[in-house]
């Protein structure tokens, strides 16, 4: 499922570029035409589908490149832990939820990107580590927690310093993913895969 999600994101980006959208720095108007999130359209215009479609659009090749690299890194492990269906559920709900939080905090900004969904996958991974910690060897647990904390710390600090990073979508996705991860970690698939 992780590879499928990466392929979908990349395919949409390539189609957008072929259709004339800049690969380096897409204009907000172009992203809106493709389904980016934007308060006046999503809320006032009743175009709620934008909460979903925005999860598959990106602000340029660097944005999608970094997002897909991170999704691959954390996604493969998290997918193994939860199984395909639950993993997809986490990804989509965290992405949409992150966009809802972003819309609440920045109603007049154009929002796009898989970051909320990816932070949700990270949150689910951390939820699994918390709930299933008794079955994970201590050294492996320490390495995984350290790696996750470094990644999240760097991204959250960068998000505070960068005006172009939607920290609210990141935090919203992370929180939703963590809650879902804690809940779903009690499932038989998660126990079997531990």
What are these regions (language model features)?
Residues 1-194:
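A detector for small-residue-rich transmembrane helices and their helix-helix packing motifs
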